[in-house]
From Swiss-Prot:
Example of a GO MF term: nickel cation binding
Gene Ontology biological process: protein folding; protein-containing complex assembly; urea metabolic process
HAMAP family: UreE
The UniProt record lists the keyword Nucleus: no
Protein's recorded name: Urease accessory protein UreE
Major location (coarse): cytoplasm
Compartment(s): Cytoplasm
CDD domains: UreE
GO CC terms in record: cytoplasm
Its job: Involved in urease metallocenter assembly. Binds nickel. Probably functions as a nickel donor during metallocenter assembly.
Family statement: Belongs to the UreE family.
Gene3D superfamilies, A to Z: Urease metallochaperone UreE, N-terminal domain, UreE, C-terminal domain
SUPFAM superfamilies: Urease metallochaperone UreE, C-terminal domain, Urease metallochaperone UreE, N-terminal domain
Species: Staphylococcus saprophyticus subsp. saprophyticus (strain ATCC 15305 / DSM 20229 / NCIMB 8711 / NCTC 7292 / S-41)
Length: 150
């Protein structure tokens, strides 16, 4: 089976869809940005993904759906630093430092998430900014954004 488009996301399930059998494809965070890949479901079925559109996969994306079954993207947990700045000043300081290192970050209402790096952990300790080292699933890929200093 070759998957060429995402047919929905479980976050938008209707009541009738909640009873369907769900087969999962577990992906590493770095695989969420790959448009073309071969994967194996948790039931041992091999499928190809060749997305027509250049979009990233996300947790809960439905790759295939029929009347009784569906194949859904799940994401393996990631080794993260969960940064919890107490003030706008702390948030600005650490965001500036991480930006200078070109580290991709994700944000919740109260946290900044970055992939674990012992140098960043040392920086957080030195700056006295609260953080936790966790294994956590993230919904989207950490994406590097290219730029130049022209």
């Amino acid at each position: 089976m070759i998957i060429e488009e995402i047919v929905g996301n479980i976050a938008n399930f209707s009541d009738s869809e909640k009873g369907k059998h769900m087969e999962k494809v577990y992906l590493e965070n770095s695989d969420l940005v790959k448009r073309i890949q071969r994967v194996t479901t948790d039931h041992g079925n091999e499928i190809g993904i060749r997305l027509k559109q250049p979009i990233d996969l996300q947790y809960g994306d439905i790759l295939y759906k029929d009347d009784k079954n569906m194949i859904v993207v799940d994401v393996n947990s990631e080794d993260l630093l969960v940064i919890k700045p107490r003030t706008l000043q702390e948030m600005g300081d650490i965001a500036h430092q991480l930006g200078n290192r070109h580290l991709p970050a994700q944000f919740t209402e109260t946290e900044m998430l970055v992939q674990y790096d012992y140098l960043v952990e040392s920086l957080l300790k030195d700056l006295g900014i609260p953080y936790e080292h966790e294994d956590r699933k993230v919904n989207k890929a950490f994406r590097h954004i290219g730029h130049s200093h022209d």
